[in-house]
Amino acid sequence: MINSDISEQLALMQLSDSFFPTGSFTFSHGLETLVQTGKIQSQPEILYFLQILLRNKVGVSDVVALIHSYRGCKNGDIEAVRVADRMLFVQTAIAKNRETQRQSGRALLMVASSTWQDERLKTLNIDAVSGNIHCLHPVIFGAVTSVVGLDERNAVLAFLHGLVTNILGAAIRLGILGHIQAQQILLQLVPDIEAVWSTAVSMNLEQMWSCTPFIDIAQMQHPKLAHKLFAN
């Protein structure tokens, strides 16, 4: 018999690992623009960038939609997953962000459906093909983590860990951060990640918001860069 606690922890590690093929490692969330324009060049600046992104955008929009998708899927209410998907799509103002969220969400759903056999994932696949859902990555992540048996908090932590490590990986590839510095930042972000969880867990979908104009402008300017390593 498989120990359920061990199974959950292994699923958490599997889903938060960059080895899991969703293409999220190709996203810089505006960091590439800010580096190329000289606005971010140091460890403290990257830390601040991540803190603002977590507290003023991801934590009060993406994570909220993730949690409601998780709860809906856990209760067998796929319509709740669809609602979370629609609400987050409206909340995501930048077209390129919507596109990349859909791409990684569809990739996640495809890989998860091939790895874990579950009727709820099959239904979401049908929805994706028929256009009933946008398939945004945070929403699909919430549904998948519910299916594989993670508890709600661990689902959020897995998502945030994956997001942060992908951005830190982008900073390393852009040449402005070393591996040891990245680990230091990851540790420094623990209070911010805890705060995101504490805030998002009690929010409803109508309360989602974001206020990161500096990052939003950088993301909108990204397509104009002469040379790009990342998709956004």
Swiss-Prot record:
Keyword DNA repair: no
UniProt-listed InterPro entries: UreF (IPR002639), UreF_sf (IPR038277)
Domain of life of the source: Bacteria
Major site of localization recorded for this protein: cytoplasm
A GO term for molecular function: nickel cation binding
Subcellular location: Cytoplasm
Keywords on record: Chaperone, Cytoplasm, Nickel insertion
One Gene Ontology cellular component: cytoplasm
Annotated TM spans: none
Quaternary structure, from the entry: UreD, UreF and UreG form a complex that acts as a GTP-hydrolysis-dependent molecular chaperone, activating the urease apoprotein by helping to assemble the nickel containing metallocenter of UreC. The UreE protein probably delivers the nickel.
Family label: Belongs to the UreF family.
Function: Required for maturation of urease via the functional incorporation of the urease nickel metallocenter.
Protein's UniProt name: Urease accessory protein UreF
Organism: Trichodesmium erythraeum (strain IMS101)
